[in-house]
């Protein structure tokens, strides 16, 4: 339904909405007089957007706007459209972009969140923006910095998620709000609208064709088309792929989440990975999808790679508090998910990541999980998982209840069911590591909670089932090469293997010993190279 070839069909004009923000300013700001600094900023912001001065737009967007928000609008809304319009000569495009920031600020800063009317108006404003750029027969004359384009798409998906949760919470709605939701605005923040927009941006930019051409060593410009040659459309298309990854993850469709990224070589850096928050968000959702698909090795590699990247580049974005908060939270979430994966699928990881796990006392909880503590598994999952949503709202005749947690509870049940299947595998692994041969009856007696009882046929059968489960769970699809994150080969993730011959278990240790020589050789060569460079500078 949403293929790359499907043309943009508009589809939003039929809603018949009003373009203004009625009473937003009156409701949130109490008609405070606009500060002179804010007036000058808005007029200058409009001018540089008209002139397409990207570096200055980025400076105003990343530095001045957050600074003014802290100084004048920390707990209240920015000026309404009506207050701003006369300052910018009613520039329609600027007002659309300004309202995007206005509603984003409402979602982030206003206690209790935006009202229903503000949520609806925010959706309509996004419709205006996408209707401005998508149906156009030629590229629009608009240049915005990549960071704004990324955060615009990211915020678009976030507000969809936020509205889905708001709509599922029926207990705090008035009769008037329920009537507005059920009768007048059934298509607002609809999942099909979100998918339609994101797929249309991907299609218009031909970003998939460009990525495939680049991977094949060809010129992406040759397949980019009229729109895809422009950085504005190309980057919107790329960020929309990441947006689709997030949407499908929120819906619990992990296979499709990875599939939409097929042109992107997830495990390689590219020219598009220059926005830290985009790269981190991509790795978070990819790693989580891999974990839920029981591809633990791929999840561990994804999390380890991005956590190393964060360690090395944190100083680049630490000064930007509005990005730093989100990055810090996702970093903590990924350490929790990595801990889960390492318990379910033990393997070696980078020493610096291990050090963080030790310093932050993850090892205590990891030990509890290895001992089968289901509560720790659940708590880690609830903290680290995305905020799942249902693709459809509660039916009109549904009882007045809070349905927000339904989607989360479903995903928790799926995850915990998998954990319960593996609950005793760490114990089996610990016993097998001690022997090269082990009689089945002896292992059965070790596993028996009541050692004074004799091992009967039923207990023996249960043990054989667990051993078969061990074999099965340790075999996973692992990505090896190619642009599709779904491809891979079956590999054993365990450090030991075994087979059963009659009543005897034969165990082989398959652990590869560390080659410390290679590590020291690389470090010596790196030091020598650094020494040569220092001597060259002195000379």
From Swiss-Prot:
Under PROSITE patterns, the record lists:
PCI
Q: Which SUPFAM superfamilies match?
A: TPR-like
Q: Which UniProt keywords apply?
A: Cytoplasm, Initiation factor, Protein biosynthesis
Instruction: Name the source's superkingdom.
Output: Eukaryota
Q: How does it assemble?
A: Component of the eukaryotic translation initiation factor 3 (eIF-3) complex.
Instruction: Report the protein's function.
Output: Component of the eukaryotic translation initiation factor 3 (eIF-3) complex, which is involved in protein synthesis of a specialized repertoire of mRNAs and, together with other initiation factors, stimulates binding of mRNA and methionyl-tRNAi to the 40S ribosome. The eIF-3 complex specifically targets and initiates translation of a subset of mRNAs involved in cell proliferation.
| UniProt-recorded name of the protein | Eukaryotic translation initiation factor 3 subunit L
Query: Organism source for this protein?
Result: Anopheles gambiae
């Amino acid at each position: 339904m949403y293929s790359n070839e499907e043309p943009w069909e508009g589809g939003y004009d039929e809603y018949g909405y009003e373009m203004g923000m009625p009473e937003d300013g009156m409701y949130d700001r109490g008609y405070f007089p606009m500060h002179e600094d804010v007036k000058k900023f808005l007029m200058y912001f409009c001018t540089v957007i008209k002139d397409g001065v990207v570096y200055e737009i980025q400076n105003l967007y990343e530095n001045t706007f957050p600074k003014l928000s802290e100084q004048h609008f920390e707990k209240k809304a920015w000026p309404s459209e009506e207050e701003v319009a006369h300052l910018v000569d009613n520039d329609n495009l600027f007002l659309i972009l300004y309202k995007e920031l206005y509603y984003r600020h409402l979602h982030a800063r206003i206690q209790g969140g935006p009202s229903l009317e503000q949520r609806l108006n925010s959706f309509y404003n996004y419709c205006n923006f996408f209707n401005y750029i998508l149906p156009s027969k030629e590229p629009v004359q608009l240049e915005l910095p990549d960071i704004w384009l990324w955060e615009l798409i990211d915020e678009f998906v976030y507000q969809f998620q936020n509205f889905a949760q708001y709509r599922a919470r029926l207990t705090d709605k008035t009769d008037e709000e329920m009537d507005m939701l059920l009768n007048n605005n059934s298509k607002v923040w609809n999942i099909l609208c979100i998918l339609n927009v994101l797929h249309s941006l991907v299609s218009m930019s031909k970003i998939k064709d460009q990525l495939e051409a680049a991977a094949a060593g060809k010129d992406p410009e040759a397949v980019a088309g009229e729109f895809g040659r422009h950085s504005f459309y190309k980057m919107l298309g790329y960020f929309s792929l990441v947006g689709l990854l997030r949407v499908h993850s929120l819906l619990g469709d992990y296979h499709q989440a990875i599939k939409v990224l097929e042109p992107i070589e997830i495990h390689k850096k590219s020219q598009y990975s220059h926005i830290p928050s985009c790269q981190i968000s991509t790795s978070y959702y990819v790693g989580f999808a891999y974990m839920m698909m029981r591809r633990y090795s791929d999840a561990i590699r994804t999390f380890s790679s991005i956590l190393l990247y964060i360690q090395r580049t944190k100083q680049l974005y630490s000064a930007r508090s509005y990005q730093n908060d989100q990055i810090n939270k996702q970093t903590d979430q990924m350490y929790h998910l990595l801990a889960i994966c390492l318990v379910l699928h033990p393997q070696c990881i980078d020493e610096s990541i291990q050090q963080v796990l030790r310093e932050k006392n993850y090892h205590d909880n990891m030990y509890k999980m290895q001992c089968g503590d289901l509560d720790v598994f659940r708590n880690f999952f609830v903290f680290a998982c995305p905020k799942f949503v249902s693709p459809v709202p509660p039916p009109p005749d549904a009882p007045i209840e809070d349905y927000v947690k339904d989607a989360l509870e479903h995903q928790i049940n799926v995850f915990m069911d998998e954990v319960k299947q593996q609950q005793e595998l760490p114990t089996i692994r610990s016993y097998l590591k001690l022997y090269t041969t082990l009689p089945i009856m002896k292992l059965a007696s070790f596993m028996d909670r009541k050692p004074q009882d004799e091992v009967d046929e039923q207990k023996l059968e249960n043990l054989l089932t667990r051993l078969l489960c061990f074999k099965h769970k340790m075999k996973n699809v692992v990505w090896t090469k190619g642009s599709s994150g779904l491809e891979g080969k079956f590999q054993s993730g365990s450090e030991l293997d075994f087979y059963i011959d009659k009543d005897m278990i034969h165990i082989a240790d398959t652990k590869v010993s560390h080659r410390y020589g290679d590590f020291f050789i690389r470090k010596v060569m790196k030091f020598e190279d650094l020494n040569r460079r220092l001597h060259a500078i002195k000379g």
